[in-house]
């Protein structure tokens, strides 16, 4: 699968020229940039030797922008202008932020996503993320000594279209050419799979600063296939910090605190959590703004106790992903840990107990995603040799269209590998129909009312035909970044309409989970409802066809035959009103039987009309 490079004659790149491409892990808590040098992926440090760049941006009084450690140092004393964990706000409206009141930020609900009020004016999450990406770009170009060809940027597997598009917009604002967006767990699989030549079924358990993702991957020689994904976009190391913060408040008998004190205690909570990775106890000592002294000791066992529910919460998506992939714990060959929060002993212990084996930790969990992204960037830039590998991601929910009767026709099933394109033909419902409304839906239920509406558009200019004669081909295409395009084309005339779906607001992981749970809980009811709707649609179509035939050719019938058909139509209308599937199907069959001879006579008449005035020799 080596990429072909095409250039103007005489201008092709020299065989030895190495294009500068990087992989960027745009994280909630920390971000990194990596590249491939001499065949090995490496994370690029800053001028002080630090590999991690805190994902923190501060807007100063003199109009400057601080990113990283310098900004993080002011979390406590300048909380309104120091933006932390901006990734949680990407592609999100104010109504999507359940914990908005718990943050020190002043939000403005704007179209598309929230904006944050700072001393330098309102800033969108895209602009804040662009400042982080700009700093990483500068670090890479300084370290590599040249301009970047492009970057592969990682995102959580559960990022929706709006969040992915926001990430692309941030990169564009930072002057980066996005080669591809890559799911974080998949990037980790690339790093582990290539370094260790791993084969088999693996679980990637990614617990970062603000998001949790789990992916089930089948790794075979040269092929990465994601069998299933799940996760929680509002669960990560920040939540563990908050549990320690709440423990501090309880132990110290505190309630309401100024923003500066909240930031100070959260910073100390994070430091204590990290200290307990390698130590059995951590002391938390500080003086609050009201001169109250905090001096407490937190043990590793106490930390495990107060965060046990958070660790257990990560195992719910793990079970869901295993079920979706149709595998058991015994089928898993190994577990890859990703994200700084997986350093916590209680997390590693819980994961090991669940999967009955110690997790893999031979790569730095903070760096593994950036390393995998760098490897992918190296391929897309054309630097990789012929020993390329294939990467397949999956769609988290089914995608489909509304059909007559309020039914959903699934075009791309859930957990389909992407990129993918699938097409299906539809037709018109009424005679002379010249337009068709295309309603794109997402979800697992059978009825439109139970699924999520993504977009609507119309296909106009369909040539007038009898019902069922037109052929409209609808194509769904999901690109490598998970963005959906839908096109509808009438085959005989070539008229076409399309839409690229970038929803203003996306689904949360909890909503996705609820949709999957509902589909399982209501599967019998949904099947019954679908059968009823299909029976009604078929019945109403038959009634409409019969009425039209009676108006044009009713003279072909004897009074008794006409009465029999009228009675059958009336019986079918009554069955439809009663909403009983069996009765509707039986009444439909009776009307079909009653009109069989009538249909034959109509066909004979139409043939005679078509042949009138023609000689056999002309045929």
UniProtKB/Swiss-Prot annotation:
Function: Chaperone involved in the maturation of iron-sulfur cluster-containing proteins. Has a low intrinsic ATPase activity which is markedly stimulated by HscB.
Source taxon at top rank: Bacteria
Protein name per its UniProtKB record: Chaperone protein HscA homolog
MF annotations from Gene Ontology: ATP binding; ATP hydrolysis activity; ATP-dependent protein folding chaperone; unfolded protein binding
Signal peptide (residue range): none
Organism, as annotated: Laribacter hongkongensis (strain HLHK9)
InterPro entries associated with the record: ATPase_NBD, Heat_shock_70_CS, HscA_NBD, HSP70_C_sf, HSP70_peptide-bd_sf, Hsp_70_fam, ISC_FeS_clus_asmbl_HscA
Name of encoding gene: hscA
UniProt keyword annotation of Transcription regulation present: no
One Gene Ontology biological process: iron-sulfur cluster assembly
Family under the similarity heading: Belongs to the heat shock protein 70 family.
Swiss-Prot/TrEMBL keywords: ATP-binding, Chaperone, Nucleotide-binding
């Amino acid at each position: 699968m080596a990429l072909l490079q095409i250039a103007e004659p005489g201008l092709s790149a020299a065989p030895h020229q190495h294009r500068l491409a990087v992989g960027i892990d745009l994280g909630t808590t920390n971000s990194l940039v990596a590249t491939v040098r001499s065949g090995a992926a490496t994370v690029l440090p800053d001028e002080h030797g630090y590999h991690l760049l805190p994902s923190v941006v501060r807007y100063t009084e003199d109009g400057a922008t601080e990113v990283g450690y310098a900004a993080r140092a002011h979390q406590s004393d300048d909380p309104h202008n120091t933006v932390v964990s901006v990734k949680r706000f990407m592609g999100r409206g104010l109504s999507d932020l359940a914990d908005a009141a718990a943050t020190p930020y002043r939000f403005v609900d704007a179209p598309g996503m929230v904006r944050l009020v700072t001393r330098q004016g309102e800033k969108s999450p895209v602009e804040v993320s662009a400042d982080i990406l700009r700093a990483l770009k500068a670090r890479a170009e300084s370290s590599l000594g040249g301009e970047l060809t492009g970057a592969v940027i990682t995102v959580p597997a559960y990022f929706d279209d709006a969040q992915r598009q926001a990430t692309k917009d941030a990169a564009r604002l930072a002057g980066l050419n996005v080669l591809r967006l890559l799911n974080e767990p998949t990037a980790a699989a690339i790093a582990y799979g290539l370094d260790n030549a791993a084969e088999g079924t693996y679980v990637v358990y990614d617990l970062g600063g603000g998001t949790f993702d789990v992916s089930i991957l089948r790794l075979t020689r040269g092929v990465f296939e994601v069998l299933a994904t799940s996760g929680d976009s509002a669960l990560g190391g920040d939540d563990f910090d908050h549990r320690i913060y709440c423990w501090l408040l309880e132990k110290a008998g505190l309630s309401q605190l100024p923003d500066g004190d909240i930031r100070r205690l959260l910073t100390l909570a994070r430091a204590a959590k990290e200290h307990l990775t390698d130590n059995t106890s951590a002391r938390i000592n500080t003086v609050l703004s009201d001169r109250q002294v905090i001096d407490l000791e937190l043990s590793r066992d106490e930390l495990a106790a107060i965060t046990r529910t958070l660790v257990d919460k990560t195992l719910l998506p793990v079970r869901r992903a295993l079920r979706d992939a149709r595998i058991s714990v015994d089928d898993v060959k190994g577990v890859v840990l990703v994200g700084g929060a997986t350093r916590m002993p209680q997390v590693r212990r819980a994961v090991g107990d669940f999967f009955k084996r110690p997790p893999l930790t031979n790569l730095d969990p903070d760096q593994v995603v950036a390393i995998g992204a760098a490897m992918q960037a190296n391929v897309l830039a054309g630097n990789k040799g012929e020993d390329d590998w294939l990467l397949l991601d999956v769609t988290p929910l089914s995608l489909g269209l509304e059909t007559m009767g309020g039914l959903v026709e699934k075009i791309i099933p859930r957990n389909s590998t992407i990129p993918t394109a699938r097409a299906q033909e539809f037709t018109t419902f009424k005679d002379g129909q010249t337009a068709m409304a295309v309603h794109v839906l997402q979800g697992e239920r059978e009825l439109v009312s139970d699924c999520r509406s993504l977009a609507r558009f119309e296909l106009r200019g369909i040539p007038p035909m009898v019902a069922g004669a037109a052929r409209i081909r609808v194509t769904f295409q999901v690109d490598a970044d998970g963005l959906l395009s839908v096109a509808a084309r009438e085959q005989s005339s070539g008229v076409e309409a399309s839409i690229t779906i970038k929803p203003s607001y996306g689904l949360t992981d909890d909503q996705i989970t609820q949709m999957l749970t509902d589909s399982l809980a209501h599967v019998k009811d949904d099947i019954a409802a679908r059968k009823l709707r299909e029976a009604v649609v078929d019945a109403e179509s038959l009634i409409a066809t019969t009425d039209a035939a009676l108006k044009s050719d009713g003279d072909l019938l004897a009074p008794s035959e006409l009465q029999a058909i009228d009675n059958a139509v009336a019986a079918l209308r009554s069955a439809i009103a009663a909403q009983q599937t069996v009765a509707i199907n039986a009444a439909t069959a009776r009307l079909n039987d009653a009109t069989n001879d009538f249909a034959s006579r109509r066909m004979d008449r139409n043939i005679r009309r078509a042949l009138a005035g023609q000689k056999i020799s002309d045929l």
